[in-house]
Structures are given as structure tokens and as C-alpha cells.
Amino acid sequence: NNPLYLYNIGYLYHKEKKDVAKGIEFYEKALVADPNYADALYMRGLIFVDESNTVVESMNKLTRSPAALKKWEELDKKKKSLLASAIPYFEKAYKGNPEDIATLDALREVYYKTERMEDALRVKREADAVRAKKR
């Protein structure tokens, strides 16, 4: 039950084999082995973001008609729900590794897209400080 081993299997399924469900299964197993495993937390959150991006693609294909407006509103609600689901994973990954730029950027973006502007600005400032420190 080595979390690194389980994470790596999840990553291979998710990214190399494009089997998201199997990737999730192994990311979750990694998180059972170590609930604070930052990489698995990040990737689990990223899957929600990827799913929300797929919803946005569907939204962008809609025409400008009354029926399409109703469908757009349904999809927008789904998109926001997916993004909200990513937040706890990114927040926990951030707590475990507060100087990881990818996590900070993902958290900022999800806060922004879920209209949590104060949180987005706070995380942006933190990311800017980390970037400045690494120069």
C-alpha cells in the first residue's frame, strides 16, 4: 500500500492510457494509504477541472436560442459543481505543499471560476511570492 506506487499506477491509467475512471481508482487508493499525498490530491482535483473543461466545450457549441439558453444554464451549473468539487483536493494539496506553483495556480483558477475572488487574489499573491523567492 505504498502511496507513490499507487499514485504512479493511477497516473499511468489517467494520462497514458486515457482511462480516467481507473486513474481515479488508484489516486483514491493512494489517498487511502496517505490522505495527505499531495500529488494524488492535485491530480484528483485536476480531473474535476478537466471534466469542467469538457462541459465548457459543450457550452461553446450551443447556438443562441431559447432552448440552447436553458441547456447552457444546466451546463453552467454542472461546470460550477465540478469546479467546486476540485477545491477540497487542491486546498489539501496546498496545505501539504504550500510552495507548489502548479497547485497554487490551479487553486487560484478554481477560486476565480467559482467566483471566490478574495480567495483567488490571496492565492495569486502567494504564488507571486513563491515565484519571486525562486528567482
What do the predicted segments below correspond to?
Residues 1-2, 37, 100, 134:
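Residue-level recognition of tetratricopeptide repeat
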